[in-house]
């Protein structure tokens, strides 16, 4: 399960004309390459911050989506010299290398038609739901997002009745609301159920290519926290 959520975002207007005029346009040049600021990255004092160039480039292999009235276009982020400043670029490179090596192996088995092998991933996301009032009483949860003290966990599978057990109405309402929010973003869930520990649950999406799956998982974690807040819950990832 993926636990960490970290993503970057820059918002540009597509109404560039001044003087009170509006002309909606979005050029291909802006889509192919943008120029946000990369001065926040550590450089060891080797360059002035205003000279820290970072470029975004459109990633057409992942799906665009609309969130909060903005068209979100997945991009890669690299330096002026082409070095990766994100985690998407190494992922795309690794997918290309896996495809290249897999096609090479297929050739050894006599397959002469396959040109590319696509990596498919369906990253399940496990999470805990805690009531806000109880969450506020636990300093370890508020500071660290996880428990640092408490009762010892049972080691004899005494809690086997929770796994695949009936989902509580409050949690079921949360899951239903989460599904609807994810559908708006083009993320389809395949499975949802209780997990082994108390208040632990799981959501598994439909398999898609690894690049899009990673992008969608970031959206899943973001929406899990937002939807939980509406239901008086706190989502721990």
Region roles according to the model:
Residues 1-12:
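Single conserved hydrophobic/aromatic residue that forms the stacking wall/gate
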Residues 11-237:
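Glycine-rich, acidic/polar active-site loops that bind/position phosphate-bearing ligands
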């Amino acid at each position: 399960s993926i636990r960490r959520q970290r993503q970057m975002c820059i918002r540009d207007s597509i109404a560039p004309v001044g003087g009170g005029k509006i002309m909606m346009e979005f050029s291909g040049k802006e889509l192919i390459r943008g120029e946000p600021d990369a001065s926040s990255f550590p450089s060891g004092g080797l360059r002035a911050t205003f000279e820290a160039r970072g470029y975004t480039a459109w990633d057409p292999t992942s799906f665009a989506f609309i969130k909060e009235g903005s068209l979100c276009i997945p991009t890669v982020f690299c330096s002026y010299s082409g070095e990766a400043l994100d985690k998407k670029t190494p992922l795309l490179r690794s997918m290309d290398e896996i495809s290249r090596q897999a096609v090479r192996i297929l050739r050894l088995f006599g397959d002469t038609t396959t040109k590319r092998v696509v990596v498919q991933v369906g990253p399940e996301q496990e999470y805990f739901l805690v009531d806000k009032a109880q969450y506020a009483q636990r300093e370890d949860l508020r500071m660290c997002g996880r428990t640092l003290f408490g009762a010892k966990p049972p080691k004899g599978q005494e809690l086997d009745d929770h796994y695949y057990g009936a989902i509580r109405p409050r949690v079921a309402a949360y899951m239903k609301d989460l599904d609807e929010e994810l559908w708006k973003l083009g993320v389809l869930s395949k499975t949802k159920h209780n997990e082994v520990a108390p208040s632990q649950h799981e959501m598994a999406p439909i398999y898609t290519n690894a690049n899009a799956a990673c992008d969608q998982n970031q959206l899943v974690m973001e929406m899990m926290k937002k939807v939980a807040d509406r239901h008086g819950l706190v989502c721990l990832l």
